[in-house]
Curated annotation (Swiss-Prot):
Name of the top EC class for this enzyme: transferase
The protein, known as: Phospho-N-acetylmuramoyl-pentapeptide-transferase
Bilayer-spanning residue ranges: 21-41, 73-93, 98-118, 132-152, 168-188, 199-219, 236-256, 263-283, 288-308, 338-358
Task performed by this protein: Catalyzes the initial step of the lipid cycle reactions in the biosynthesis of the cell wall peptidoglycan: transfers peptidoglycan precursor phospho-MurNAc-pentapeptide from UDP-MurNAc-pentapeptide onto the lipid carrier undecaprenyl phosphate, yielding undecaprenyl-pyrophosphoryl-MurNAc-pentapeptide, known as lipid I.
Predominant location category: membrane
Lineage: Bacteria, Pseudomonadati, Pseudomonadota, Gammaproteobacteria, Pasteurellales
Coiled-coil intervals: none
Matching InterPro entries: Glycosyl_transferase_4, PNAcMuramoyl-5peptid_Trfase, PNAcMuramoyl-5peptid_Trfase_CS
Native organism: Glaesserella parasuis serovar 5 (strain SH0165)
Domain of life: Bacteria
Length: 360
């Protein structure tokens, strides 16, 4: 929005030309989202307390979690608000990629909101009926996938980038839609499963989003894309604004979510942020790199799949409890230790992921 205003005002004062630079707008988007998050955080928490939107906990979970019952949830609302306002202010809204991410972010946010509301209304952890939850997640993802394919069909925007191989970029064709669907829905649910401890999901989200800000900038810059042997994608540069807005909103939320948490993001936050991360990875053609940098999310999701599969096939559990962060808690690790170690692992994976851009 401010891009349009600056384009008009630059004829009167060339200083407004600074708004045309992605680097300036990305910093401002981060600061705007951070300030909004810090500003509205306490108000949102008080409102959630008044509405009695408190967290329900699993009866079979670690005993240390019982004290979390009643902690305000659905704090993801403040994250979405901060990202939305920051993006509308600082992003170029003529860019279709911006709208694809916002569509997933707020579409999944609505699904997550309904899921959270049902958990609160029923006073259990079941939430929205699974088949309806995945139906709507799938519909939203497929609408985005078809739209993205229509814009980028038969161009670099629909190639698969393989880490470590600079000349291996197969054209996906219609398989692009299938891959996009699984990346968006899969990442959304993986982040949702990770969001079980104070600050456990939001910090890896911040790190990975920050890394994708760098990747989006490189992908949208022809010279850097050629230097790194990655596809140059016309619209991807503007995704830097969204990534930094996610970082800023995430930091603002972490202020209140750090151990011991004053608020939880709920499914309204985890489903939407995970979906946004997935669609950004698709748009910059780095789905495989997302698996590396988001390794913590992948392992959390795999631990649930393996646990359920093992129990159904062998009537035996692999872990003491899934997702895997609960396994470590039941082994005696204090919650802060689990959280910080997962953060450290994510930092290592993000750095490894960024290094692979050059190792080709």
């Amino acid at each position: 929005m401010l891009v349009w205003l600056a384009e008009y005002l630059v004829q009167y004062n060339t200083a407004f030309n600074v708004v045309s630079y992605i680097t300036f707008r990305s910093i401002m988007a981060l600061l705007t989202a951070l300030i909004i998050g810090l500003w509205i955080g306490s108000t949102v928490i008080r409102r959630l307390q008044i509405l009695k939107f408190g967290q329900e906990v699993r009866h079979d979970g670690p005993e240390s979690h019982y004290k979390k019952r009643g902690t305000p949830t659905m704090g993801g609302i403040m994250i979405l608000f901060a990202i939305g306002v920051s993006t509308l202010l600082w992003a170029d809204l003529r860019n279709p990629y911006v709208w694809f991410v916002l569509f997933i972010l707020f579409g999944y946010g609505v699904v997550g909101f309904v899921d959270d509301y049902w958990k609160i209304a029923r006073k259990n952890t079941d939430g929205l009926i699974a088949r309806w939850k995945y139906f709507w997640l799938s519909v939203i993802a497929l609408v985005s996938a078809f739209g993205m394919y229509a814009i980028g069909k038969d161009t670099a925007a629909t190639q698969l980038v393989v880490p470590f191989f600079k000349d291996v970029m197969p054209q996906l064709g219609l398989f692009y839609i299938v891959l996009t669907y699984f990346v968006i829905v899969g990442t959304s649910n993986a982040v949702n499963l990770t969001d079980g401890l104070d600050g456990l999901a939001i910090v890896p989200l911040i790190m990975v989003a920050g890394a994708f800000a760098l990747i989006a900038w490189a992908t949208g810059n022809y010279n850097f894309a050629q230097y790194l042997h990655i596809p140059y994608i016309k619209y991807s540069g503007e995704l830097v604004i969204l990534c930094t807005a996610i970082v800023g909103a995430g930091l603002g939320f972490l202020w209140f979510n750090t151990y011991p948490a004053q608020v939880f993001m709920g499914d309204v936050g985890s489903l939407s942020l995970g979906g946004a991360l997935g669609v950004i990875a698709v748009l910059v053609r780095q789905e495989l790199l997302l698996v590396v940098m988001g390794g913590v999310f992948v392992v959390e999701a795999l631990s649930v799949i393996l646990q359920v599969g093992s129990y159904k096939l062998r009537q035996k559990r692999i872990f003491r409890m899934a997702p895997i962060h609960h396994h470590f808690e039941l082994k005696g690790w204090p919650e802060p230790r689990v959280i910080v170690r997962f953060w450290i692992i994510t930092l290592m994976l993000v750095l490894i992921g960024l290094v692979t851009l050059k190792l080709r």
